[in-house]
Amino acid sequence: MAKAIKRIQKIEVTEEDQRKRDLREIEDALIDHKEAILETLHMLGHMNERGVLPLLRGLFGQGDKVLDILVKKADTEETANTLKNLLLLFGTLGMLDVKQLEPLILKVNAGVASAVEQKNSEEKTGYFDIIRSLKDPEINKSITLLFSFLKGMGQDTKELERTTQPPEHQKHHQEPREKRGMNKRD
């Protein structure tokens, strides 16, 4: 019968052999990711040309001072309000339906182009010219679009509104002005 193995001998790798293996592993990784590495080196070269790397080196060299300044600036009420407003703005932008907005933007661009053409014109527009222009289908369509926009803008949207006010101040802003002891014209 065979004897039980009581001692396992580890194959000792010399430092030189380990170094050769490590170099081979690095070479393989370089070859596998050649494109990404070359692109990164190219990008770092551009950053160095534009002075970004020395700037970053300086920032990291003065890390504690820079971090202290950033924390002090971020700890102001203005910064907090700015962040709240940015979040509200991004939320509002997320609600926009770009498919519906695209035709309107194209029309605005066409209107701007037309206005630029008329910019240097010495032609004066009188009251009768304005009334006569209402018969023009393009102007009539634009005015109808403008009225539709104004009507939509005037709709009640309180249930959709988001606020940047703290919860304790939100109730104050939602109460009618008369209940707060203010006249409608205040």
UniProtKB/Swiss-Prot annotation:
At the top level, the lineage of the source is Bacteria
Q: Where is this region: Disordered?
A: 156-186
Q: Which InterPro entries match?
A: DUF1641 (IPR012440)
Q: Which Pfam families match?
A: DUF1641
Q: Where is the composition biased (Basic and acidic residues)?
A: 173-186
Q: What is the name attached to this protein's record?
A: Uncharacterized protein YjgD
User: Which organism's genome codes for this protein?
Assistant: Bacillus subtilis (strain 168)
**What high-level taxonomic lineage is stated for the organism?**
Bacteria, Bacillati, Bacillota, Bacilli, Bacillales
